[in-house]
Amino acid sequence: MSIKSDKWIRRMAQEHGMIEPFVERQIRGEGDERVISYGVSSYGYDVRCADEFKVFTNINSAIVDPKNFDEKSFVDVKSDVCIIPPNSFALARTVEFFRIPRDVLTICLGKSTYARCGIIVNVTPLEPEWEGHVTLEFSNTTTLPAKIYANEGVAQMLFLQSDEACEVSYKDRAGKYQGQRGVTLPRA
């Protein structure tokens, strides 16, 4: 497996719709305003967070059960920023829609700007032939409220291409998150 470069990412996005919408260079500011960077980097793609959030609350739940998750455990927020309570978390989604090639595995790493503030981004790998908006999980590990910015960079996708295509892809096995749009809650 080898990591793919900006040139490969650009070609796959433009010719095969791997990332939509696609920003072909790294954006660090818009006019006089600084933003947390997004777009193509040397060996990855920095994704943006959309303005749809689900902020965790423990008002209605006593137990968090991934096999029987209660949607009332979240408060929906639509805003340019999301405030995550101390020691809590929020779900969001990427602005970008991904179509992963059959011979590629994509790994997501949180941006250091957030990590250095105690905000951790978690995403499981994007498997071969998976497609959809990526659901992002933000953990606020601090004892203070934490702010997430919509439409700015939050994580970096790294594309690893295998020397051969897999026998069975995510699409082949009809994975439960295939084609997801918007913020997607746990499915057991």
From Swiss-Prot:
InterPro entries the record matches: dCTP_deaminase (IPR011962), dUTPase-like_sf (IPR036157), dUTPase_trimeric (IPR033704)
Entry keyword set: Hydrolase, Nucleotide metabolism, Nucleotide-binding
GO terms under biological process: dUMP biosynthetic process; dUTP biosynthetic process; nucleobase-containing small molecule interconversion
Superkingdom of source: Bacteria
Name of a matching Pfam family: DCD
Binding sites annotated in the UniProt record for dCTP: 111-116, 135-137, 156, 170, 180
GO molecular function: dCTP deaminase activity; nucleotide binding
Pathway where it operates: Pyrimidine metabolism; dUMP biosynthesis; dUMP from dCTP (dUTP route): step 1/2
The UniProt record lists the keyword Acetylation: no
EC number per UniProt: 3.5.4.13
Catalytic activity: dCTP + H2O + H(+) = dUTP + NH4(+)
Catalytic residues identified in the record: 137
Cited PANTHER family: DCTP DEAMINASE (PTHR42680:SF3)
Protein family per UniProt: Belongs to the dCTP deaminase family.
Function text: Catalyzes the deamination of dCTP to dUTP.
Subunit architecture: Homotrimer.
Name of this protein: dCTP deaminase
